[in-house]
Amino acid sequence: MFIIEIFISIIYGIIEGITEWLPISSTGHLILIQDFIQFKNQSPAFMEMFNVVIQLGAILAVVVIYFDKLNPFKPGKSARQVQKTWQLWAKVVVAALPAAVIGLFLDDWFEAHFYNLVSVSVMLIVYGAAFIYLERREHEEPAVTDLASLPYKTALQIGLFQILALFPGTSRSGATIVGGLLNGVSRSVVTEFTFYLGIPIMFGASGWKILKFIKNGNGLGFGQIFLLLVAMGVAFGVSLVVIRFLTDYVKKHDFTIFGKYRIGLGGVLLVYAAIKALMG
């Protein structure tokens, strides 16, 4: 029944809205839930496209929350504020380019070789351990404590870490946050920059998946479009809450809890993968 597929879209939207921004891997959660909750009447090609395109709902939440800061044409902005906005966009572009270029050519290869329970589990655990290590080591005061002072070189270094997010289970936000922490960027600054960095990456990835879907001879029916819109709408609403939560959270807390969660989830996925293998 179509009503069940709408309900499934809502579940996917909730998961996307939460896991896209928290550094806990949206892929790790989607690959698990797909074994239990699936659309009965949709093709694998549609699901591959669906899982990426619903991210547009999440990224629209960033645009809405930070619209004034991201809009260089906002009335009333001083020349200095306009300049800062353009500089911010320039840093976002610099950081986005490495993953965009590599992803364009190797995304299918990464997905074919690493989109499985074991690979995702390993990346969840590895980055979980990285978060815990980074937070427990001796800390120097962050060199970058506001976004305006983020050097272009550091933005590029964060972008290079984002390439690692091509490995399913890494987490795009997780990779960029680790990159920022290693390069002396404060938690709040790297978290906010991660939000902005998602704008070109997610729009580009979604456009690419839609193009591939259509080029391979697939069509989108009204029902499929509706399911996409439902999931995107839910992801948008949930993201509005999660982004505000994470922004406040990192001002007072570190990322240790997310590291522990990743290790726990990775362990659960490894056990689940072993059980599946034993059961044939």
From Swiss-Prot:
According to its UniProt entry, the protein's GO biological process terms are:
cell wall organization; peptidoglycan biosynthetic process; regulation of cell shape; response to antibiotic
* Superkingdom assignment: Bacteria
Q: Among the entry's GO cellular component annotations, what is one?
A: plasma membrane
Report whether Hydrolase shows up as a keyword of the record: yes
Known EC number(s)?
3.6.1.27
Q: Give the stretches traversing the membrane.
A: 2-22, 45-65, 86-106, 114-134, 147-167, 188-208, 223-243, 255-275
Q: GO MF terms on file?
A: undecaprenyl-diphosphatase activity
Q: Which reaction does it catalyse?
A: di-trans,octa-cis-undecaprenyl diphosphate + H2O = di-trans,octa-cis-undecaprenyl phosphate + phosphate + H(+)
Q: Which UniProt keywords apply?
A: Antibiotic resistance, Cell membrane, Cell shape, Cell wall biogenesis/degradation, Hydrolase, Membrane, Peptidoglycan synthesis, Transmembrane, Transmembrane helix
| Pfam families to which the protein is assigned, alphabetical | BacA (PF02673)
Membrane as UniProt keyword: yes
Q: What does this protein do?
A: Catalyzes the dephosphorylation of undecaprenyl diphosphate (UPP). Confers resistance to bacitracin.
Could you share any additional remarks the record makes about this protein? Bacitracin is thought to be involved in the inhibition of peptidoglycan synthesis by sequestering undecaprenyl diphosphate, thereby reducing the pool of lipid carrier available.
Which HAMAP family is this protein grouped with? Answer: Undec_diphosphatase (MF_01006)
- What this protein is called in its record is Undecaprenyl-diphosphatase
Specify the species: Streptococcus sanguinis (strain SK36)
**Could you tell me the gene encoding this protein?**
uppP
